[in-house]
C-alpha cells in the first residue's frame, strides 16, 4: 500500500506520503498559480510514487453536514477516480486539521509560511495519519507477567 494524502485547496494542495509502515510524511505542497498545472502536478506525483490509495481530506461541518468545501472535495475525489483509474480514493474527515497544523507554527511566522504550503502539507499529513492509524492500529502492549 502506497498512499498519498491530499489537503485540497483552491490555491494550494497539501501532500503527504505513507505506506504500510503506518507513518505519514509531509511532501512539498503544490503551489503553482495555474490550477491546471497544479492538478497536473498532483496527477504526476501520484503516478511517480505509484500510489495505490489517495486519501482526500473531507471538510465536513461540525454538525456532520457537507458544506461547499466538502462538496468540492467530493468532486475532486470523483475526478481522481476517473483520471487515476485503478487507484482507490478515500474521503477522510478532516475537521480542524488545518487549524491543528497551523497551531504548530508560531503566530509571527504563519503569514509567511501559509503561502509556502507548509501548513497545507502538515494538514495532509494529519489526514493521512488518521487514515493509516485506522488501517494499521498500533499493537496492544503485552500485559506484564
From Swiss-Prot:
Gene3D superfamilies named among the record's database cross-references: YqgF/RNase H-like domain
Keyword match Hydrolase: yes
Keywords annotated in UniProt: Cytoplasm, Hydrolase, Nuclease, Ribosome biogenesis
Organism: Opitutus terrae (strain DSM 11246 / JCM 15787 / PB90-1)
Protein name from the UniProt record: Putative pre-16S rRNA nuclease
Family matches, as PANTHER family: POLYNUCLEOTIDYL TRANSFERASE, RIBONUCLEASE H-LIKE SUPERFAMILY PROTEIN
Pfam families with a match to the protein in the record: RuvX (PF03652)
Single GO cellular component term: cytosol
Coiled-coil stretches noted in the UniProt entry, renumbered to this chain: none
A GO molecular-function annotation: nuclease activity
Biological-process GO terms, alphabetical: rRNA 5'-end processing
UniProt function note: Could be a nuclease involved in processing of the 5'-end of pre-16S rRNA.
InterPro entries xref list: RNaseH-like_sf (IPR012337), YqgF (IPR005227), YqgF/RNaseH-like_dom (IPR006641), YqgF/RNaseH-like_dom_sf (IPR037027)
Family to which the UniProt record says this protein belongs: Belongs to the YqgF nuclease family.
